């Protein structure tokens, strides 16, 4: 019984934050940016670091440098970048919640591309309409230790 409990606890560690990934395609922002044959409406699961934020009249646009995702769907910020994308969210979005430098994971659908610039370099941004977004707490990447420990302790009051 004890072994079943321990295995259950270990298996629960690092659970994905976005559970509905049934229709997610294995496509990277670079694949879309480079003109691959990927249809609008394709569902993706991407994550990365916020580098720019813009509230427009009826939606917000968040520029994200993409990174591969860990098992818990957190962006692996120490890995090489997989390109950039623009996350589009409806209505007004609080800029403090999506501050530059924070990391996020999004499940969304591709909605075409937009030509823009990264500094002086022309760049084609994949547009993603967000369906489910998780913003990671500051410093999440430094807290990757196991959440289960075994030990004996004594509490004294």
List PLM regions with ranges.
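Sec-dependent bacterial lipoprotein signal peptides
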Residues: 1-13
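OB-fold and OB-like single-stranded nucleic-acid-recognition modules
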Residues: 13-157
